[in-house]
Amino acid sequence: MGLNLKDLVVREKTTLEAFSNKVIAIDAYNAIYQFLASIRGPDGLQLSDSEGRITSHLSGLLYRNVNFLSLGIKPVYVFDGKPPSLKTAEIERRKQIKMDATIKYEKAIADGNMEDARKYAQQTTSMKDGMVKESKQLLTYFGIPYIEAPSEGEATAAHLTNTGQAYASASQDFDSILCGAKRLVRNFTNSGRRKIPNKNTYIDIVPEIIETQKTLDSLELTREELIDVGILIGTDFNPNGFERVGPKTALKMIKQHSKLEEIPQIQEQLEEIDYQEIRKIFLNPEVADVKEIVFENVNYEGMSNYLVRERSFSEDRVNSTLNRLKKALEKKSQNLDQWF
């Protein structure tokens, strides 16, 4: 479900160009799910190759990373490991949502309502066997490093911002902030023009950056207190949150009482969750100890062969895209040489 801190954090609109020459630690699963959900045909079906294997994730990774590298951005993808045991309820909740959406999708198709069909199809998105391996293979051709987190990917991404190995973490979820990320970038892998469902209207989605310390200063909270605000609203580890408590009420409660244990009206509900363990997951998460982040040269031939010959991508489109990347990187290299 992610954490609903949208109305509380200090968000500043920015551009992708602002992250040139910066390492950005991307929540890999979050990005890949976005590609799988959004890159679809008019009927809501995902893109696929000649053997029927889904390729929407590969298409998203191809075009986004070409864009990143062309702008001088240095992406690092952080993949999830084993989820904390407290996440089981949230995982089951997501499965049920997908099952319900599948029924609605089939009805929309039968009714000929393609707008609803596409909407419900996006809600059925799931990571199939092999997609993670395929994504890592494509990243290797790009020369883009990826990291295997021991548990939640966004926690390791947050950790990298604190070791100075990354400028910011990138995810649509706000959890990185509770995990201690110095900066969080939203709309990083899905910026662009998007159609509003059921309306003939488009909006421009732009990246936004959240400086954690600015948010804490604005709210006059410590990180520990913000974690308690998050628990009141609902996290992946207590997805239902607390009854009749939204972001503003949660903030008011913590500003008045400082911590969960001191809020009289929630004590009965508080006994139903392991709030101490949830705090621990955010304050002291399991993270990967990354010695060095190494970027390699792009393997243009290997990438083209994989996408065109093995995954049925258009040869003209792939080669055109890779040529654009090659020219952009050559231009940046020439500009750099002029300084020496």
Swiss-Prot record:
User: According to the lineage, what is the superkingdom?
Assistant: Archaea
Question: What processes does the entry annotate via GO biological process terms?
Answer: DNA repair; DNA replication, removal of RNA primer
Q: Which residues bind Mg(2+) 2?
A: 173, 175, 236
Q: Which cofactor does it need?
A: Mg(2+)
List the molecular function annotations (GO) for this entry: 5'-3' exonuclease activity; 5'-flap endonuclease activity; DNA binding; magnesium ion binding
Keyword list, A-Z: DNA damage, DNA repair, DNA replication, Endonuclease, Exonuclease, Hydrolase, Magnesium, Metal-binding, Nuclease
Annotated region N-domain: the residues are: 1-98
Q: How is the cofactor bound?
A: Binds 2 magnesium ions per subunit. They probably participate in the reaction catalyzed by the enzyme. May bind an additional third magnesium ion after substrate binding.
Recorded hits in Pfam families, A to Z, give: XPG_I (PF00867), XPG_N (PF00752)
Q: Which residues lie within the region annotated I-domain?
A: 116-258
Enzyme Commission number, as recorded: 3.1.-.-
Q: Which family does it belong to?
A: Belongs to the XPG/RAD2 endonuclease family. FEN1 subfamily.
What is the protein's quaternary organization?
Interacts with PCNA. PCNA stimulates the nuclease activity without altering cleavage specificity.
Write the protein's name: Flap endonuclease 1
UniProt lists the gene as fen
